[in-house]
Amino acid sequence: MRRAAALVSSAAGRGAELGSRGLIFEPTLPLEALVRGVHHLSIGSAGSTTLVLQTVLAPMLFGAGGSLAVTGGTHNKAAPPFPFLEQVFLPRLCEMGATVSATLPRAGFYPAGGGELAVEVEGRAALRPLQLMERPEGARARGVVLSANLPPGVAHREQRRSRLS
């Protein structure tokens, strides 16, 4: 993640190696001096593309923005899956004044990975506070059952059980 943040913010750093006991991250330019970029990152495993995006989103939003494509896992344990990013997280950011869009060219599941997440970010964002004090009228809870390389019965069973809860 340090390498991803360094890429989008023209930063230098060290200590991201396996077994490191410390981390140094030094931006080399102020945010206003960053130029819009087209970035490609490969996690090289099923590591979470959405966690990488959440790491680099702030420097991209407040800097010059740009596009980012990340390959790795898009649907992982202990990480927000792409649908959460697309349907919950990014819409709230946009309500605050950000201009961010995301697409899922290819899904990648743990343990294989191989997915791709792509985002476009307009930089120089001036975000407003977001106050969520009441549940919006018409709001409802919903769920999506998504599976890969499993018999269809597994997804159907999960769907049936979630309706009973």
Where are the model-predicted features located?
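Phosphate/diphosphate-binding glycine-rich loops and adjacent basic-rich segments that engage nucleotide
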Residues: 25-26, 31-37, 42-46, 62, ...
